[in-house]
Amino acid sequence: MARYTGPKCKLSRREGTDLFLKSARRSLDSKCKLDSKPGQHGRTSGARTSDYGLQLREKQKLKRMYGVLEKQFRKYFAEAERRRGNTGETLIQLLESRLDNVVYRMGFGSTRAEARQLVSHRAIEVNGHTADIASLIVKAGDVITVREKAKKQGRIREALDLASSIGIPQWVEVDTNKMAGTFKSMPDRADVARDINESMVVELYSR
């Protein structure tokens, strides 16, 4: 299945929440009408959505937020099931520790899609080695750096300025001048994906 390349607002409108697919340079309200579903006149409310439908929506929201396709998402879920602890929370931790997401959290990309592009274009190093796999799992203590030849890119400086004004998450430490950061630890569940009910995703895959 190909990665979605259509309008980002359409996905956020469909899920009725900000999926953080667009830069925060402008407020989401000025770009997307979240209270209006996709379609010429929006979808009218009908019968109550089934439990399965609600579970499916939560899964779609999570996949779209992190830019992960179904096959890969199932692998993350299987890995989360194998690990100790709460499966839903572990799933979100795995998604949060993807390299493209960490690059985004550090402010090197204004969106996860932009961060993914930086990785695929070999603009990022992990512990001194060039990394071009967006799904690479970053571990606590790993150092993420923008490569020297990429530091001149205006979009990276703009993204860092934006991240600094909004606030860089406490679970990463970033030197904006050196364009380098350390992934200190996994984030607390309460700090990420707040609009996601991961227990519904677990219920969906447990059917």
From Swiss-Prot:
PROSITE patterns listed in its UniProt record: RIBOSOMAL_S4, S4
InterPro entries, alphabetized: Ribosomal_uS4, Ribosomal_uS4_bac-type, Ribosomal_uS4_CS, Ribosomal_uS4_N, S4_RNA-bd, S4_RNA-bd_sf
Domain S4 RNA-binding: 97-162
A Pfam family that the UniProt record links to this protein: Ribosomal_S4
Any one Gene Ontology BP term: translation
GO cellular component labels: small ribosomal subunit
Entry-linked SMART domains: Ribosomal_S4, S4
The entry's keywords: Ribonucleoprotein, Ribosomal protein, RNA-binding, rRNA-binding
Top-rank lineage group of the source organism: Bacteria
Gene Ontology molecular function, alphabetical: rRNA binding; structural constituent of ribosome
Subunit and partners: Part of the 30S ribosomal subunit. Contacts protein S5. The interaction surface between S4 and S5 is involved in control of translational fidelity.
Annotated function: One of the primary rRNA binding proteins, it binds directly to 16S rRNA where it nucleates assembly of the body of the 30S subunit.
Membership in a protein family: Belongs to the universal ribosomal protein uS4 family.
Protein name: Small ribosomal subunit protein uS4
Highest classification ranks of the organism: Bacteria, Pseudomonadati, Pseudomonadota, Betaproteobacteria, Burkholderiales
Gene (UniProt): rpsD
